[in-house]
Amino acid sequence: MNKLNKQNIINHVNNLQLKKSVPNFQVGDTVSVSIKIADEKRTRIQKFDGLVLRRKGSGLSETFIVRKESSGVGVEKNFHVHNPNIEIELKRKGKVRRAYISYMRERSGKSARIKEKVVNTK
């Protein structure tokens, strides 16, 4: 098998595993990620609501970081966009001018607010 055929097979398998319905979210948006957790006896869904700090990569390896404040402590989680065990729901569009808003880690209270993006639906 030559190299071109191997690459075609790899691309085909990757395309089969991509999610069909990924919401159009960006850095600065507020999302709710529902994580399906399989325990020994049952499966449950855990929600993680927060701000998207970064979206990175492409294809199956595309990831994003969500940050939230829980009991005064900042919590960040990395997720794969095409993970079959998560569902992403867009709650609010934010207006930022960076691809990675790491400065939000030092912010709290009113300084941690992000302007809401107004979307025209004409």
Curated annotation (Swiss-Prot):
SUPFAM superfamilies: Translation proteins SH3-like domain (SSF50104). Gene3D superfamilies: 2.30.30.790. One of its GO terms (cellular component) is cytosolic large ribosomal subunit. One of its GO terms (molecular function) is structural constituent of ribosome. GO terms for biological process: translation. Keywords: Ribonucleoprotein, Ribosomal protein. The keyword ATP-binding does not apply. This protein is located at the 30S-50S ribosomal subunit interface and may play a role in the structure and function of the aminoacyl-tRNA binding site. Belongs to the bacterial ribosomal protein bL19 family. This is Large ribosomal subunit protein bL19. It comes from Mycoplasmoides gallisepticum (strain R(low / passage 15 / clone 2)). The gene is rplS.
